[in-house]
Amino acid sequence: MVLPTVAIVGRPNVGKSTLFNRIAGERISIVEDVEGVTRDRIYATGEWLNRQFSLIDTGGIDDVDAPFMEQIKHQAQIAMEEADVIVFVVSGKEGVTDADEYVSKILYRTNTPVILAVNKVDNPEMRNDIYDFYSLGLGDPYPVSSVHGIGTGDVLDAIVENLPVEEAEENDDIIRFSLIGRPNVGKSSLINAILGEDRVIASPVAGTTRDAIDTHFTDADGQEFTMIDTAGMRKSGKIYENTEKYSVMRAMRAIDRSDVVLMVINAEEGIREYDKRIAGFAHEAGKGMIIVVNKWDTIDKDNHTVAKWEADIRDQFQFLTYAPIIFVSALTKQRLNKLPDLIKRISESQNKRIPSAVLNDVIMDAIAINPTPTDKGKRLKIFYATQVSVKPPTFVVFVNEEELMHFSYLRFLENQIRAAFTFEGTPIHLIARKRK
């Protein structure tokens, strides 16, 4: 299901990150009382009144070297392009500022619902000061103390009230995939090359996210695919499309909608921190993964080149041991014909179910090879295991004491399950649970 997007905007030091964390329900942003602190995590999932939504802290997208007004203009433009609902955060302690008026004039022109949250209203006496914010022309101001959690419920009520109508579940028979990677790694060329293959029939269809265009095609075997647009075929204001932090946000949204993620690396430039960050997000989200090294035609090669590259990739992406690596060229179409079948195999792995009896035979064989650990004279006992879900395949292992299940033994069991059932290209999750 595609989640609607809520963007938080506002000038530095008004408490955007604190409100973000309060709504997301966990401390996932770096919060310091210093103006302009950048944050690593700018994207999370929020839930209120049984409605889920994607939450974006646009303050984390700022170019900190840019002039102040350019930063907040950037935030507002991103919010207007990307969001279904905008939460504009101001400070009740400082009152209306020139920067607040500047942002409000930009937001006033949008058709996107704007919720005005007056933060740092930390005591009842301060509520009388919020009326000045009516001058911004954005409707009723909501008094909030995000540090203490006061008033956030009212803001969440307003968010849910303004979310678009829930969309119907998407067809599970269609495999959805996206190509993600840093700007200029050749994603567009790869997309064009994939769609240019004679074996596929491509047609642009209206996407389910705001202003997006996805591409639907069918292969020679009749399998339907949807390629999710991460390039952002959006309205004309694409000033910041090639900035790296902006592309992080786009990539995260695409990952949310994908069954399989193709992590594209530019062979000419190698692996960067951006690649590891985005790949980590896809891994945490439980998505199928393929590592695609593009522009392979530009590399001088000998008999050891592929092995060296594979070793380096495995070293840099140690959490992606399950992900296949493929070396391609969008220009020469080298190995591109292998991608649709590889995507299909990984989708099958994502949806694979293992009968409990067969699974437990593998678990018992694993214990015979490597007995369960002990701690302070007490041995871990595994009673049985069962698969509880797919996408990604998730297994619960019932034990006598959860604390005795060390992560290294869980990893051993995961490796044994992989060896038995070949979960190609997908993470699998093992959860230890005490038997009642």
UniProtKB/Swiss-Prot annotation:
Keywords recorded for this protein, A-Z: GTP-binding, Nucleotide-binding, Repeat, Ribosome biogenesis
CDD domains according to UniProt: EngA1, EngA2
Swiss-Prot/TrEMBL GO biological process terms: ribosome biogenesis
Ligand binding (GTP 2): 181-188, 229-233, 294-297
Gene Ontology terms for molecular function: GTP binding; ribosome binding
Positions of the EngA-type G domain: 4-167, 175-351
A Pfam family reported for this protein in Swiss-Prot or TrEMBL: KH_dom-like
Gene3D superfamilies (alphabetical): 3.30.300.20, P-loop containing nucleotide triphosphate hydrolases
All residue ranges annotated as the KH-like domain in the record: 352-436
Family of this protein: Belongs to the TRAFAC class TrmE-Era-EngA-EngB-Septin-like GTPase superfamily. EngA (Der) GTPase family.
Function statement: GTPase that plays an essential role in the late steps of ribosome biogenesis.
Known partners and oligomeric status: Associates with the 50S ribosomal subunit.
Protein name, per record: GTPase Der
Lineage of the organism: Bacteria, Bacillati, Bacillota, Bacilli, Lactobacillales
Encoding gene, per UniProt annotation: der
